[in-house]
Regions:
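Conserved core of the PLP fold type I
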Residues: 52-176, 187-205
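Conserved PLP-binding catalytic core of the aspartate aminotransferase-like
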Residues: 273-274, 278, 282-317, 333
Length: 355
């Protein structure tokens, strides 16, 4: 090809999603096993009547519904909507970082942080995890005059860990106020006390804090792509400036609004996942696996160099999990019968490999 492309794209990997294998148990993408919440199907059907029209690019009705959901301290001006929270991550990089700037995050973490930073021409500062958890002290020590943005993935993907709420507060208090801190809470609905942070209070108290959430996970709208950010109005305005118009469809907006009206059902569903998470995690530890206490809808198995064999043998057993090189495996919490199949395989695998 003769067209001249940006040098930042050199070596940039293409994102590889979790595999879908017909007939196999998919525990690779952290999807909920539940369908849409009550009222969502009807909202989607009604929205299809107007698909010949462009959606509301400002997502005004959804922003108003989210502000009401978040509480009386928040108005629509505190909310930005994006095509999944991943697009909002990219928008945050766009509005803060360019060539010569630095973006800090723990590693291993969400796979799209590094390429998003690379495309911007900025430098990714990857701070190693401690005990599979973001090391906030080390991240603070990594702050320089070039730091523009810090991502705190909480719960962290793929390790399913959270930072202690008081430690997060101290960290935010210590970071210079001109540096934006993004708390990425894609899995926050699965966190339970005492590890549940009051991230919205951190937004209220600090104009340099933004919280990212999504409808893809607990709400079960992964196929519709809706996420949102909560932050200071000036920050929200900047996010809107780099938002690609019309990317959140009318159907997606309608489904998200309807989902907010099903809070009781959402809690019942997440409680069911949390119970299964505890069962799966305990059974894996009893079988001889090591794993940090999970706080999301998945479990992290730090298998090291044994990772490829586990993944291959799981695939042979018609179970698809998510590998991370030779670091470990992320296993989503599925339906009880899916989890039972995983546990049978895992017990057999560890017995054979450690015999």
């Amino acid at each position: 090809m003769t067209a001249r492309l940006r040098p930042e794209l050199a070596g940039l990997p293409v994102y590889v999603p979790g595999k879908t294998v017909p007939g196999a148990i998919k525990l690779a993408s952290n999807e909920t096993v539940f369908g849409p919440l009550p009222g969502v199907r009807e909202a989607i059907e009604r929205a299809t009547d107007a698909v010949n029209r462009y959606p509301d690019s400002g997502c005004m009705e959804l922003k108003a519904a989210l502000a009401k959901h978040l509480g009386s301290d928040f108005a629509p001006e505190h909310v930005a909507v994006g095509c999944g929270s991943v697009s909002l991550c990219q928008q945050l990089v766009q509005i803060t970082a360019s060539v010569g700037d630095e973006v800090i995050f723990g590693w291993r973490s969400f796979e799209l942080y590094p390429p998003q930073v690379q495309v911007a021409g900025a430098t990714a500062i990857q701070v190693p995890l401690t005990n599979h958890t973001f090391d906030l002290a080390a991240m603070l020590a990594s702050v320089t005059g070039r730091t523009r943005l810090i991502f705190v993935c909480n719960p962290n993907n793929p390790t399913s860990t959270v930072v202690a709420p008081d430690a997060l507060t101290r960290f935010i208090d210590a970071v210079p106020p001109h540096i934006l801190i993004a708390i990425d809470e894609a899995y926050i609905e699965y966190v339970r006390e005492p590890m549940l942070p009051d991230s919205l209070e951190l937004v209220r108290a600090h104009s340099n804090v933004v919280v990212l959430r999504t409808f893809s996970k607990a709400y079960g709208l992964a196929g519709l792509r809706v996420g949102y950010a909560v932050g200071h109005p000036e920050l929200i305005t900047a996010l809107n400036q780099v938002y690609v118009p019309f990317t959140v469809t009318a159907i997606s907006q309608a489904a998200a609004i309807a989902s907010l009206d099903a809070a009781d059902e959402l809690l019942a569903r997440t409680d069911a996942v949390v119970a299964e998470r505890a069962r799966v995690s305990a059974a894996l530890r009893a079988a001889g696996f090591t794993s940090p206490p999970p706080q999301a809808n998945f479990v992290w198995l730090p298998l090291g160099p044994r990772t490829p064999d586990f993944v291959t043998q799981a695939a042979n057993a018609r179970i698809v999990v998510r590998p991370y090189g030779t670091e470990g495996v992320r296993v989503s919490v599925g339906a009880p019968e899916e989890n039972d199949a995983l546990l049978r395989f895992a017990r057999d695998w560890i017995t054979r490999t450690e015999a």
